[in-house]
């Protein structure tokens, strides 16, 4: 089993965790037909993708 030789400093711990923060979703697209907002490269809630119906409900 691996055991650390020395305790990592607060600085090293902070540098390791510097990329762990969550970021807000900033790029929402608007559907051409319904005007609904959705994530890029995802279908809308009513089944449209790039202006076409891809899932029939």
UniProtKB/Swiss-Prot annotation:
Q: Where is this region: Disordered?
A: 1-38
Question: What Pfam family does this protein match (any one)?
Answer: Ribosomal_L32p
**GO terms assigned for molecular function:** structural constituent of ribosome
Q: Which residues are listed as membrane-spanning?
A: none
Biological process, per Gene Ontology: cytoplasmic translation; response to radiation; response to reactive oxygen species; ribosomal large subunit assembly
Subunit? Part of the 50S ribosomal subunit. Contacts L17.
What protein family does this chain belong to? Answer: Belongs to the bacterial ribosomal protein bL32 family.
Query: Protein name, please?
Result: Large ribosomal subunit protein bL32
Organism equals: Escherichia coli (strain K12)
Q: What is the lineage of its organism?
A: Bacteria, Pseudomonadati, Pseudomonadota, Gammaproteobacteria, Enterobacterales
């Amino acid at each position: 089993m691996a055991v650390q030789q020395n305790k990592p400093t607060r600085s090293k711990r902070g540098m390791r965790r510097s990329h762990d923060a969550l970021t807000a979703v900033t790029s929402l697209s608007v559907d051409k037909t319904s005007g609904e907002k959705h994530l890029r490269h995802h279908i809308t809630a009513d089944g449209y993708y790039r202006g076409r119906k891809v899932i029939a409900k």
